[in-house]
């Protein structure tokens, strides 16, 4: 089956026409070669083709109807003629959708036309002399088909289909003719003149847009018939099936779902724009709506029964996995259409969302000013968009949102549920405020153009439909950006390529803003709503370009990101559009690269400075020595590196005339000391020691670091050790500075060295616990019960411990959580192990 009457096109493999194609009857399985047939217009109006009795009658009825229209317009008046042809159109439209619909429904389920023909022997040899109906049917087919056509050689299904085509020709041509005549009668009352069209105004714009829509409608019809031929045009697969045929998506079937029911009715709205008559628009909407009912209750069930559903039933839904593996998970609250779905009376956030919506709508009773409502709507849209952008961007780059909850003791799934609440709340708030803004603006209008209003609501309906299609294709998991938060639940990474995503790569950027632009029409092009619609459009494009697309490439691969939709393939066939698309891709790519600047700039800067200082650091005083004693296990020549908690030993030597008892040695971060090598301008923050035991007798820690001191005749030398009482417990590049007397004049500077974070053992929870205890014991910050105690070492605070865990395991944990577990190291390490396991699975 195709869709000039359906969403899918069917064509025989490697064939341009169904003529000569092998076909098979649906029930009997009888095979035959399909003879050549012609489309509707050629059958009726091409004088070179033979005409059957019914085809002549159809042509004459069309001519007679046009003549009667002219007569009734001249004699009975335009209003009477309009009502007459409106009634005719509705009658033929019901005959189409209800009459043909019932026939096809029963033919699809019971093959009742085929069975009726067989039961009455309509095409049997010799039956013509016994039954006037058989005689007429055989005469009709014989007069229509070429002379060499032998009716008896073809199955009943094919002959019945040929007769069914005649009925379809009558109904479709009269349906089209009466609609066109009704539009022409309405256009006769229009105020559109040629002089008016020569100037740029609303009337000329709608006429030009309407004309363009008409031309596009003609292209849709022609291209659809090119793809599917008359086999699908006349619902051939309700009678017989083509062998070796496949569902195809080509031409117009590649750019729209159900093109003959969607964009195939674009002309209806085109003529409504041209006439500017809202009554024509309402009639067009009614006709289009009836056609959608025909699609839903006749076409779609038959397509799914013959070819299977669009979305494979075997597809594994991540939503079902989540529910199956987590008993405490419930489906999230969703704002669908104008109501809420999945409301859970035991979930407080649902009451908050619904209550906020109700309160916002109730605010209309306060008669707020237009300016106030617009400002609130603009503020809400900007803030909600920025919040969504920030969370998703950070979540994509470093799992920030998940880590935020994990570090505070919550689960990965709970963080996802909180995101669902935030996203749905933001969506609800932006839509509710936009609706209120539109209502206030609409009330303020002195007069209303109902044609604009109706077209506005059509765009709103299109937006609602698109959201429904997106939800059907992505499921709740995709709707809430689940692949940002629960990557470990995705067993087979694959982007949705069915439903609306077969035709549009990012439908939210096109159809997802239709409602916002619909409010522009409803409010008669108010500046406020134009601004809001523009922001809506830009925010959607920014989200897709700078958040979704980079994440898709990361999770699903660049080849999935480069996949073209049906509309994209069609449009990129035009060279100017392809050039513009390539330029836009390069531009957005460069912006994405700017956003992806490494966050490790500080670490890299420290390394660069350390390398430079290795060459420039020297003794600032002659005949002096100031060296860090090397540990052969941890350091090699030219590379000083110590692990957090390791003691560092320094040897120094100074001429006696330069030495003072109050000389001291300080420990500093290289980045904090600045470029002054002769004077230290920053505080040591108590990371210092004396050079002897007499200079600072009241400072126990300062003199406790002195391990050796010798005063000779010509020089003074010593050895000090910086241990847990004086060291930093954060990674970085450091240096020691030897200061004269109690001031900050620098006499000597050590080579720069690194303090690094030890890699804790993450093989098992017990291994992590043991390695953590060993490290903290070395740092002297555990009490007798094995708990972390800040008072044991003032340099190793909660914040420092957090950084230590983050840098050594990649998992962050909050101080609030550590307080909740009373700083129990086993509880903390078990939580870190679980976090690390989850975060690794998300990569």
Curated annotation (Swiss-Prot):
Pathway(s) annotated for this protein in UniProt: Phospholipid metabolism; phosphatidylcholine biosynthesis
Any coiled-coil regions, as ranges: none
Q: Could you confirm whether the keyword Transcription regulation appears in this record?
A: no
> Any idea of its EC number?
2.1.1.17
Q: Which stretches face the Lumenal side?
A: 1-52, 105-166, 221-246, 301-348, 393-419, 474-512
Alphabetically, the GO molecular function entries are: phosphatidylethanolamine N-methyltransferase activity
- Annotated GO biological process: methylation; phosphatidylcholine biosynthetic process
Q: Name one GO cellular component term.
A: endoplasmic reticulum membrane
The entry's localization annotation reads: Endoplasmic reticulum membrane
| InterPro entries, A to Z | Phopholipid_MeTrfase, Phosphatid-EA_MeTrfase_fun
What sections of the protein cross the membrane? 53-73, 84-104, 167-187, 198-220, 247-267, 280-300, 349-366, 372-392, 420-440, 453-473, 513-533
Tell me what reaction this enzyme catalyses: a 1,2-diacyl-sn-glycero-3-phosphoethanolamine + S-adenosyl-L-methionine = a 1,2-diacyl-sn-glycero-3-phospho-N-methylethanolamine + S-adenosyl-L-homocysteine + H(+)
Query: Highest taxon of the source?
Result: Eukaryota
> How is this protein situated with respect to the membrane?
Multi-pass membrane protein
Question: Major location, coarse class?
Answer: endoplasmic reticulum
Which Pfam families is this protein grouped with? PEMT (PF04191)
Q: Keywords of this protein's UniProt record, alphabetized?
A: Endoplasmic reticulum, Lipid biosynthesis, Lipid metabolism, Membrane, Methyltransferase, Phospholipid biosynthesis, Phospholipid metabolism, S-adenosyl-L-methionine, Transferase, Transmembrane, Transmembrane helix
Q: What ranges does the Cytoplasmic topological domain annotation cover?
A: 74-83, 188-197, 268-279, 367-371, 441-452, 534-843
Q: Which family is it part of?
A: Belongs to the class VI-like SAM-binding methyltransferase superfamily. CHO2 family.
Function (record text): Catalyzes the first step of the methylation pathway of phosphatidylcholine biosynthesis, the SAM-dependent methylation of phosphatidylethanolamine (PE) to phosphatidylmonomethylethanolamine (PMME).
The protein, known as: Phosphatidylethanolamine N-methyltransferase
